[in-house]
From Swiss-Prot:
Description of post-translational modifications: Is synthesized initially as an inactive proenzyme. Formation of the active enzyme involves a self-maturation process in which the active site pyruvoyl group is generated from an internal serine residue via an autocatalytic post-translational modification. Two non-identical subunits are generated from the proenzyme in this reaction, and the pyruvate is formed at the N-terminus of the alpha chain, which is derived from the carboxyl end of the proenzyme.
Active site: 88 (charge relay system), 145 (charge relay system), 248 (charge relay system), 248 (schiff-base intermediate with substrate)
Keyword Membrane among record annotations: yes
Cofactor note: Binds 1 pyruvoyl group covalently per subunit.
Cleavage (non-hydrolytic) (site feature) positions: 247-248
UniProt modified residues of type Pyruvic acid (Ser): 248
GO biological process, one term: phosphatidylethanolamine biosynthetic process
Matches recorded under PANTHER family: PHOSPHATIDYLSERINE DECARBOXYLASE (PTHR10067), PHOSPHATIDYLSERINE DECARBOXYLASE PROENZYME, MITOCHONDRIAL (PTHR10067:SF6)
Subunit structure and binding partners: Heterodimer of a large membrane-associated beta subunit and a small pyruvoyl-containing alpha subunit.
Protein role: Catalyzes the formation of phosphatidylethanolamine (PtdEtn) from phosphatidylserine (PtdSer).
Protein name according to UniProt: Phosphatidylserine decarboxylase proenzyme
Source organism: Herminiimonas arsenicoxydans
Amino acid sequence: MSNRLPVLPQYLLPKKALTIFAGKVAGAKAGRVTTGLIRWFIGKYGVNMTEAANPDIRSYASFNEFFTRALRSGARPLADDPYICPVDGAISQCGTIQKDQIFQAKGHSYSTTALVGGDHELAAQFDNGSFATVYLSPRDYHRIHMPCDGRLMRMIYVPGALFSVNPTTARGVPNLFARNERVVCVFEGAAGPFVLVLVGATIVGSMQTTWHGVVNATRNGNIREWHYDKQYLGLKKGEEMGRFLLGSTVVMLFPHDTLSFNPSWTAERPVRLGESMAQTVAAITPPAMQADVS
């Protein structure tokens, strides 16, 4: 069966209207109705509330409060390695960026330039670099943290479609992650620039960052950009940088010769915030080779 057949209904659905409606429902403070919705969601998706800082579902005034719940202290210890996984989820793909193309799924790649909103100069910094795409399912923790230390330089809001971003849709919708609404966060790290892209989806009510709040509140169809290079906004490895109000996908971009993903990082593997994601290239270069370079 064609990979496109299962996703054909998504082309017909009024995705924006559904997303706006879902956002209103998720933000409503409806007492017992809200608690009932939360209880149903936990049962439907198998959410582990023992990991939550506040496991009492009756204390959440809205579904959004529940969905963006904090984890209890110690639930996600951070690995000592230079790069950690920034979210709970499952690896969609990871690998090398080749000729401005990022692998999406069998038969599909998309443009790095398109992903970052058409900025050729920004995209060029990641030629032959590394990428990782992590999908956050409904059951997952939906706050996004820093994979390494970084100084925020820019943020770009790119309007777009609102297709689902689950694995079935990734196999069936071309250019999915460069097609959907997204927020591009550009950082400067110890090894150079890196990017975290928060990709929206059907019924993702909003995307927030810790320094700005809700980024896509208006959805007026225009690319918007913020510059932070004149101020110092530094975030530490493991520090929260954003969150999804109803889940989605994070795409990470790193420059050439910056890092090497751990061998265990393969497509469809479940991952958790704080686990080791990658080593710096210098850290894994054999001593003899290091001597030759110097």
